[in-house]
Amino acid sequence: MINMLPSSWRAAPRPALLGLLLFFCAGFADGALMPFFPLWASSEAGIPVGAIGLLFGCYAGGELLAAPLIGGIADRVGRRPVLIASSLGVGAGFLALFFVHGVAVTAIVLLATGMCESVLHPTILTAIADVTPPSAHPRWFSLARVSSSAGQILGPACGALLALVSLRSVFLAGGTILVLGGIVMFFALNETSGIGHAAGDDRLDGGDDEEEGLSALLPAFRDGRLAKLLLWIVVFEVAGNWIEAVVPLYAQDAGTLTPSGVGALFAYAAALTVGLQMLVIRLVEVRSALWLTVGAGLATILAFALLAASPAMLTLIGAVSLCSIAQMLVGPLVPTAVNALAPPARRASYMAASSVAVDLKDSLGPSIGTALYALAPRLPWIAGIPLVAIASLGLGAAIGRARRPSRPTEDDATPQLGSAVENYR
């Protein structure tokens, strides 16, 4: 594992290290929020199970509303101000959840929080890509997942302790850590846009910088390969999200786990990612995209099969373990492929489009998953098996096509594209 890390942390680009820190903060906040939100909504807030997914949908809905307007804003105003504003905005939204009462106000807060979050993760990845060479992107994106997962260990663990007092208090912890992350970015982060742009890239910047509007901010409408890639990402992530969204209800209704036990379960899943992600990247570097996505699909299918068989403790542990392995396989694969497709002047826009596709799981995943669960407790797992099988094949094929140059006449861009995705053949 040591060989996978940069040879010297002191020599590593400072913005990339700060990006890892912000991923940790965001992972902590998500880890503190996600496992406990359904439990808080159904117990303390008195919200019907079938409506919990709609509140999740408000969070992701804010991202979808904001993406066409501000999805590529970091390409125009810079990475630094976007990271500061978005981290403070998301943190303030989580803090507000501690104080609000009522479904309507909660929905408004989640909508506003989602709007701020729409640019947080993609801009972090963009800043990392700005200051690291394409050949190092897979490892840095894997480190980003490790940092996020480290936060997701402490988040549920902290949430499990706070849940003993009040489920609402987990929002306070998640919001505080993100606000602190935003303050650190304000004092320590330098602007990264323009770093790593070769002289030959200026001709790409000139035409694209003049484009405005929806087509410039959502490149999926202009890049057919990216659109196909994002479609399969959405399908795969939505189905995979059912484990995170439905397992807390499934385990509690079966009497298997308490709210604190749910937090411990997801903390374990995050710890597994921290321990194995940098080892899995060795496998990622020597296997084809189709091999990796099929492996992730098989792991998710087996997790669904275990959950459909029984809500016992061992099956819950096995299911979240398999889900973590699946995410380790495809997690670094997707941003690397998207970054390879992106023109330098639209890197943040492409990352934002990818992030929106992934974040659809936070609306469609819980909405569909909890609706299926309301019909029958095992229905999400049974329905998810064929869906994941199809999505894993489609995603592997789409990522494989991403390694072919999209602009063969642009000699300067082609080598960069090929090298960035070469590790994922």
Label each residue range with its predicted role.
Residues 1-13, 190-230, 416-424:
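Juxtamembrane intracellular "pre-TM" segments in multi-pass secondary transporters
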Residues 30, 112-124, 323-334:
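Core transmembrane helices of Major Facilitator Superfamily
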Residues 36-50, 245-261:
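Short amphipathic helix-loop junctions that connect adjacent transmembrane helices
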Residues 60-68, 152-153, 270-278, 362-363:
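Residue-level signature of mid-helix packing/kink "hotspots" within the transmembrane helices
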Residues 66-78, 276-289, 373:
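Helix-to-loop junctions at the C-terminal end of transmembrane segments
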Residues 81-95, 291-305:
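Structural signature of the two symmetry-related core transmembrane helices
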Residues 110-150:
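Cytoplasmic helix-loop-helix junction between adjacent transmembrane helices
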Residues 346-374:
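A late C-terminal transmembrane helix in Major Facilitator Superfamily
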